[in-house]
Amino acid sequence: MKSTPTEPLSKESLPKESIVIVWFKRDLRIHDHEPLTTAASLQNKGIKVLPLYVVEPDYWQLPDSSARHWRFISQSLAELNQALLSLGQGLWVEHSTVISVLQKLAAHFNIVGIYSHQESGNLWTYQRDKDVTIWCLKNKIKWHESEAYGVFRRFNDRDRWAYYWEKYMVREKSIAPVSLAKIESLKVYNDRPGFDLPALDLTVLERDENKHLQEGGRSRGSACFKSFLNERGKQYSFNMSSPLTAFRSCSRLSPHIAFGTLSLREIVQKLRKQAKTPHLEDSWKRSLRSFDSRLHWHCHFIQKLETEPLFETHNMLPVFDGLRENAFNEDYFEAWKSGNTGYPFIDACMRCLRHTGWLNFRMRAMLVSFSSYQLWLHWQRPAWHLAQCFTDYEPGIHYSQIQMQSGTTGINTLRIYNPVKQSQDQDPKGVFIKRWVPELSEYNDEYIHEPWTMPMAMQQQKGCIIGTSYPQPIVEHVAALREARAKFTAFKQHHPEFWQQAQALNAKHGSRKRKAKSKTKGTNKKIANTRTDIDQLSLFQPI
């Protein structure tokens, strides 16, 4: 009996297969991933799991996006895909808007639900998530969002925040699924490799500045954490302030936390387990406690942006509107961006950052302080430049700290750094300067911090003429600082609403972790009874 030939099934003739989507964002791992674990538990009901990552073109055109972010993400995605393939279903990557991707998937699959972590990103991702929420409501698809890392949505009780953060961190981690059923019908939906990363045209920073960047992927993050816990972290609390020692002694986990190759909870739990090691040396105990504290502050600052997304674009204290915006000096900005201000330590830090994607917290704070006070630049465009430079760019920490360092929070002491003193304190022999500002490699200790003071005959002998081979200082920093302080004082005096706004801001966003000091100085006396942020926490990525 002859069989009757049949035509291949078309997309339209196939019944819709039921799936749930796990939307990966800044959580590029399978371990301690609650959305993935929860979605996988539905497989016993015949519902398959589609792991999805969307490369969104408009996002990568934003002024705070850069090639080094994509480089780290793409490396992490490749490793995530391998981990998912080992479970049975690889990562499906789309290059489009999330709404378009969901619309296409909904035309071919019965989407039972979408699972993801909450994202406390920039304003663009905030608006995108609002659009996805509307789409899900219109299409009667439930979007389940899990807490990402001790940052809580629609949370207004700062007095209880630390309690809930701790409760989240000690909670049992989510277990990775054992297997994921392969979705064979994806071949009919789109006959292409599911894991297909686009070649993005991102030239924000020169390609030759990407030689020393940290690489992404969970395996690298795990190895980095292991070396910190077992060796590098011993002198963390002592070595974090100088760029000479911070590159080795700091954890270097910040990009892995920012893009989620490791979960903050697993880091906290392993860290605390290590701290309980019998007969642990005091130096280790001190460093591990210090690191644990900074993980707490990491979320404290992200919570601010989660609660007040407009901190990305608006002064935290509206009274400061107009303080610097109309006095932006393009020449100063370009000199600062390129590391050509004439202040060797400032320039070394900026050039180092551009090449490595990382800098320790004190030096990050110094760069912002210099742009804000000595150069009197409004913080928005410097914030974008630094965001592009930082491989570990985390919007919540970034904009909170940018505003703190530029003085627009009203609840923190003005953090004004003397670039020469910082140079002398943190790089006394000029080792760091000479590495990143090779023009000054022949200058000795006496002149390396203030090369413009070297006699001309000696400059000629060294082969580096200040003003020709290396720039003169673009401002006189002592006079510039004096002028900046005077401007702040006058501005506050002419705006009596300052104190009321500062108290309201502190009530909503200030830390409650420590009690305020009994003695205070300067203009913050009036809010000392409520303020508890402490000066040493100039963190950016506090790890």
Name the predicted role of every residue range.
Residues I30-H31, W124-R128, R248-S249, S287, ...:
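Short, glycine/acidic-rich beta->alpha junctions
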Residues H31, F72, S76, G217, ...:
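Soluble or luminal CAZymes and related metallo-dependent hydrolases
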Residues I21-V22, Q61-D64, Y115-Q118, E206-E209, ...:
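Glycine- and acidic
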Residues R252-D445:
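Active-site-proximal binding-pocket segments
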Residues M1-L180, R351, S400-Q401, V478, ...:
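Trp/Phe/Arg-rich N-terminal binding region typifying the photolyase-homology
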Residues P35, S76, L80, G221-C224, ...:
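Alpha-helical packing segments of well-folded alpha/beta enzyme cores
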Residues N139-I141, R160-V319, V431-I543:
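Glycine/tryptophan-enriched, flexible segments
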